[in-house]
Structures are given as C-alpha cells and as structure tokens.
C-alpha cells in the first residue's frame, strides 16, 4: 500500500469516526509563515489551536503544551516541557523570561541557559523575524524543517507537512525502509534526512537559524570538558550529579500530580530510582512486559522496589492483537504519524495502546538518556573504537546492510553530508568521538523516533536529559564510564539499598548469534574502508 493511499484511508475513516482523531500527530506542533484556514478538517479536526508568534503562525495539537513570552522585539517559545535543576525553576513562563534575559546578554549566555534545562522540548527564540530553534539535550523532541513553495515549516512530524503540501517519499528512503536489512538495526534514517527531500532533521547540540533561509549551526561544545582525575574530584562530582538528578526529579513532583517512574533492572533505571531518594512518596512505580524477554527486567525492578519498601505495579501487556479494539487501524495511524520509517513491532504497538487506554499517569520518568555516557559501542562490539569515526562507522552502527552494498554507499553519502554540516567529522575539543556519535547520531536519530511513537500515551520526561549533567558524566575517565562505575557510585551515594538488592540484568542485546554476526559485519565493512569525508 502506498503512502498516499494510506493517508486517504486514514482520512476517510477519521472523517466518519472522530474517536481516534486525537491519536493522529499527537502532541504535534507546526510553525509556519502560512496561515492555515481549514483547522476543522483533516489532519487537524478542530483539536489544534493557532497562536500568533511574531509574523509566524504556531499550530499546536490539544495534547501538546506551549509557553510564550514577548519582551520588545524578542519572543521566547517553549514547546513541550522544561525545568531547571540548577535553580529549581519549573514553570515554563519563568524559563521563557530567563531565556530572553540571557539572549540580551549574548548568544553564548543564551545557549548556556538552554543547557541548564531538562525535559523534552523545542525552544524557539524569534528576534525581529529571525528564528533560532534548538531542542532538549538529546534532541528527543522532533524538529524537522524545510522551505516549500516559498513557505517555511518547522514541525514535530514530517508527515504532517507532507500531507499539507502533497510531498512524495524519496525513492531511496523507500527502498531502505522496505529492505530486509533495515529492521536489523535501529530503524532510523541516515544523517539528518527525512522521507522527504524537502525536509531535514535538526539534532543534538546544534541550532536551526532561519533568516530568509535555513542553516544548521553548532553551539556545543565550545571548549574542553573538565577531566576528573583525583578521588576528591570524582567524589565531589558524584555528589553533584546525584544532587542535580534529584533536583530534576523534585521539579517533576512539583509540576505534575500523577507522577510515576518506569523501572527495569538496568543501570540507567536504577540510577534514577536511587536519585529519587527522599521523594519516594511523590511517585508510583511500574514495569511492563509485552514479550517474554521483558519479564526478567520487570521482575528485577520489583525486587529492587521490595528492598526499598516501595509498591510496584507490573503490567502484563496482552500478547494478541485481537485483544485491542481497532488494532489494525491504530497501527496505520501510528505508521503515518511516525513518518513510515520507525517500523514498530506489534508488541510495541500493543504496549502503547495499553498505556493510552490506561491513562493512569500525568508524567512518566524514563532514564535512558544517560546511555550517552556509558561507552555503548565498545561494550557492544568488544573492541577498542578508533579515535576518529567516519561515515561508514555511522552507517553500520545504524543498519547492518546485509546484501545491500548500494544502499550502504548511499547511506555513507548521507552521513558525509551530515557530519560536514554539523561539524562532527572529527573529535571536538577533548570529547571522545564515539561519545558524540552516540549522543548526536544514536540518540538524535533513534531516540527522537522512539519518543515520537510513544507520544500516543501519557507524557514522558528524563531527569538525565540535561546537557550539563551529561557533560559531568563524560568528564569521568573512559574505563570508569565503560564499567558503569560512575553510575554505581551515584547509586551508592544516593541510596545504597538500590545496590543492596543485588539485581544485575545482563544486556541481552550484547549476546548471542546476532551480535556475533553484527561484530563480524562491523569489522568487515570498516576495516578496509577509506573515509571520503576528509
């Protein structure tokens, strides 16, 4: 079925039946210089509102939140949510004021203030018609942009713009997504492309500037990060990281009523739980399993909660699609809203529908942003990564490309363009290239796709999705981060009972025949490759 036909099918059903209209492009936004006159029709259906921002029109879906403050010729906009664990401000109107004040000092001060903020958000500043847009630390909130028929579009959902403008999917993207190799990997597109040639993706640590035309500029890093060598230094900053994560969790407890922390037995999750010490009565705790492999994690989480005296809820997600009303249609809605390249598995869709229908929480605290600091690639491939990675490494990290050498070369070309455009073709200051690759490519490309699909249910946040906190993590020695020593020291400092539960869940992703094949493919495809980027 072609994308065009699927759009028509969705429109036909939603025109007749309003029940699922709120699921289409849920929590979406669209900034454009074109006034839209049909907000009662597909794809808006009367549940999007219009806000005038300088000379632009901002359209917001009913489940999304937006905050706007104007001072003189400056307008600050936060789409989504944000909070500051450094000064404990958690009302976005106050944060908009702070951003305007910082911008008045200078661009460096402005982005330093941006880097203090935790949450899932897109931040825009409009200065006499000029737009400066950036995202949360790991760019988990989508920001796609383009100029079509001399009109600008900045949005969470490329497919929304495609529907409005009649765009056609790029044949190369279609070939990649439909290939057998695509799902053997992270299910995202190479570089900063989208399914449509007219639109591109903004990513972590960069900002979008619009001043008659679009360009991407880097604002982080601007200097070396600290290097914690002495035990005194390490102890001091273990305490600081724990305090800042705790502060962010405290901000969440103040911002929302029905707060929950989703748990597994993994390192990131346990670190968040330990840092919530002193706030445990403000949260509920849950795990789920939508396939048998997830049950081990869920049972580990329950054991930790038992050791802390916390009530834990385990949700058993039904394993049959037939248990959910209109499953096939909701699957099509999700496929459309996630731009046809996320390729969600049925068990994931069942989980999302279950949580949507449950509607039990205002905010869920997740933890996986801190993976940025855990030397993922070396732990997975069990080899020392080169100091400088290239476009081929990025392609193979993304998709295994078994039997598709033509697609592999095409992917390399997209990454060459991306790395040059973002200034990531070589290490920046004393940051390890692999760390920035994971932060800006794995998290930026894959993470934003995951969050986009999870917008179907309650709102999520990540107390560790903060640029300054991640920088502190990265300031610890490589081997200590790789062994999870840093996370374990934070747990021990914040709540030793989390460690005393003795729950250690092995990462099944790092074992088995599949990973052996991936290691072999990585070595074969990178060993003799000569980079074309320099």
Spans of features found by a protein language model:
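Acidic, carboxylate-rich catalytic segments that either coordinate divalent cations
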Residues: 355, 526-534
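Short, intrinsically disordered low-complexity segments
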Residues: 25-26, 441, 524, 531
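ATP-dependent adenylate-handling active sites, centered on carboxylate activation for C-N bond formation
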Residues: 1, 5-21, 129-132, 140, ...
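Cysteine-centered catalytic environments shared across enzyme families
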Residues: 2-261, 271-315
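Short amphipathic alpha-helical segments embedded in low-complexity Lys/Glu-rich regions
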Residues: 507-509
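Structural motif
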Residues: 108, 112, 171-175, 425-436, ...
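Acidic, low-complexity intrinsically disordered regions
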Residues: 44, 406, 435, 442, ...
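Core structural elements
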Residues: 437-449
């Amino acid at each position: 079925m072609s994308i065009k036909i699927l759009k028509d099918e969705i429109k036909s059903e939603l025109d007749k039946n309003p029940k699922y209209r709120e699921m289409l492009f849920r929590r979406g936004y669209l900034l454009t210089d074109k006034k839209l006159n049909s907000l009662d029709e597909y794809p808006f259906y009367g549940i999007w509102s219009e806000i005038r921002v300088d000379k632009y029109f901002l359209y917001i879906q009913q489940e999304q939140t937006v905050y706007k403050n104007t001072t003189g010729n400056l307008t600050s906009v936060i789409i989504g949510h944000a909070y500051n664990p450094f000064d404990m401000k958690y009302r976005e109107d106050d944060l908009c004021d702070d951003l305007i004040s910082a911008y008045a000092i200078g661009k460096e001060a402005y982005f330093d203030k941006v880097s203090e903020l935790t949450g899932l958000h897109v931040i825009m500043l409009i200065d006499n018609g000029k737009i400066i847009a950036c995202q949360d630390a790991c760019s988990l909130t989508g920001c796609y942009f383009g100029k079509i028929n001399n009109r600008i579009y900045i949005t969470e959902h490329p497919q929304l713009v495609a529907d409005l403008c009649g765009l056609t999917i790029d044949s190369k993207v279609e070939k990649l997504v439909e290939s057998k190799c695509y799902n053997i990997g992270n299910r995202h597109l190479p570089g900063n492309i989208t399914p449509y040639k007219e639109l591109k993706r903004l990513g972590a640590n960069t900002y979008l500037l619009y001043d008659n035309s679009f360009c991407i500029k880097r604002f982080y890093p601007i200097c070396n990060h600290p290097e914690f060598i002495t035990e005194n230094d390490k102890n001091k900053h273990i305490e600081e990281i724990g305090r800042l994560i705790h502060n962010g969790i405290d901000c969440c407890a103040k911002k929302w009523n029905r707060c929950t922390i989703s748990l597994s037995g993994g390192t990131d999750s346990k670190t968040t739980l330990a840092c919530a010490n002193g706030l445990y009565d403000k949260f509920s705790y849950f795990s789920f399993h939508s396939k048998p492999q997830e049950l081990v994690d869920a049972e580990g989480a329950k054991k930790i909660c038992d050791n802390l005296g916390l009530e834990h809820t385990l949700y058993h997600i039904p394993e049959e699609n037939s248990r959910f009303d209109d499953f096939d249609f909701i699957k099509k809605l999700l496929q459309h809203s996630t731009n046809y390249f996320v390729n969600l598995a049925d068990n994931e869709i069942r989980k999302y529908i279950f949580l949507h229908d449950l509607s039990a929480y205002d905010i869920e605290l997740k933890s996986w942003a801190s993976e940025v600091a855990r030397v993922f690639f070396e732990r997975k491939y069990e080899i020392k990564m080169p100091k400088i990675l290239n476009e081929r490494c990025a392609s193979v990290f993304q998709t295994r490309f078994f039997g598709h050498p033509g697609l592999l070369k095409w992917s390399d070309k997209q990454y060459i363009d991306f790395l040059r455009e973002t200034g990531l073709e070589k290490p920046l200051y004393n940051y390890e290239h692999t760390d920035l690759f994971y932060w800006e490519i794995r998290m930026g490309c894959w993470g934003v796709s995951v969050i986009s699909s999870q917008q179907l249910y309650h709102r999520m946040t990540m107390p560790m999705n903060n640029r300054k906190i991640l920088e502190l993590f990265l300031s610890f020695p490589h081997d200590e981060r790789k062994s999870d020593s840093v996370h374990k020291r934070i747990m021990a400092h914040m709540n030793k009972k989390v460690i005393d539960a003795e729950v250690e869940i092995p990462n099944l992703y790092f074992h088995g025949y599949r990973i052996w094949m991936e290691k072999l493919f990585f070595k074969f495809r990178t060993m003799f490759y000569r980079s074309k980027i320099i």
